[in-house]
Structures are given as C-alpha cells and as structure tokens.
Amino acid sequence: MADLKAFAEQLVNLTVKEVNELATILKEEYGIEPAAAAVAVAAGPAAGAAAVEEKTSFDVVLKSAGAAKLQVVKAVKEACGLGLKEAKDMVDGAPSVVKEGLAKDEAESLKKTLEEAGAEVELK
C-alpha cells in the first residue's frame, strides 16, 4: 500500500515534459493511448496554481448567532432584505450561508456588520 501511495505521489508531481515521456512509453511499449490520462495529470499542477490566485468571489457564512441572537436576526433581515421569519430561520439554522458571490469589500462589510451585532461569521 505504501508503494502505491509513493507511486501516486510521484505521478502527481510529474512535470509536463515527464508526462509526455510517460505517454510515449505507455504507447510504444504497452499499446496504451494515454491521451486522457496525460491531460488529467498535466492539469493537476495547473489547478493547484489557480488556487494560489486571490479569490474574487466570497460567501458570507453565519457560524453562530452568539449571545445577541435578536440583534443578529435584525442584522440578517436588513442585510438580506428578508422577512423576520426568514431571517430568524437562517440564524436558527446556523451554520448557514447569508450571501453568496460577493466582492471582497462587500463580503467584509457584511461580515463586520454581523460581527458587530454579535454573530460569529466566516468568509469562504
């Protein structure tokens, strides 16, 4: 099992040149057409590089209402334009997503508003 894990680790860390060499060996010696596998392996490191880029879209997640539940319900109601019952249900159902796909400054502003009301909030 450890050998397979080490092999998988080596496979994931291959460079594009090494992936191309592996594709050639698989085709010539074993008759395997590795086109789809080569694309998947080559995309692995690129996907990791994309994750390093700064996020531009954030979700505001209410983790808990804290002690001042009423104030948090009011803040959620105003921020989301919800009715009182919907806002209360959202707060009671924590953890819950308050808003999705916000710009960084909007998300931080909403987070600050909810935290000032007493909520525990997280940006994802």
Swiss-Prot record:
GO terms for cellular component: cytosolic large ribosomal subunit. Coiled coil: none annotated. It holds the Pfam family Ribosomal_L12. The keyword Glycoprotein does not apply. Keywords: Ribonucleoprotein, Ribosomal protein. Gene3D superfamilies: 3.30.1390.10, Single helix bin (1.20.5.710). CDD domains: Ribosomal_L7_L12. GO terms for biological process: translation. GO terms for molecular function: mRNA binding; structural constituent of ribosome. It comes from the Bacteria. Homodimer. Part of the ribosomal stalk of the 50S ribosomal subunit. Forms a multimeric L10(L12)X complex, where L10 forms an elongated spine to which 2 to 4 L12 dimers bind in a sequential fashion. Binds GTP-bound translation factors. Forms part of the ribosomal stalk which helps the ribosome interact with GTP-bound translation factors. Is thus essential for accurate translation. NCBIfam families: L12 (TIGR00855). Belongs to the bacterial ribosomal protein bL12 family. This is Large ribosomal subunit protein bL12. It comes from Bacteroides thetaiotaomicron (strain ATCC 29148 / DSM 2079 / JCM 5827 / CCUG 10774 / NCTC 10582 / VPI-5482 / E50). The gene is rplL.
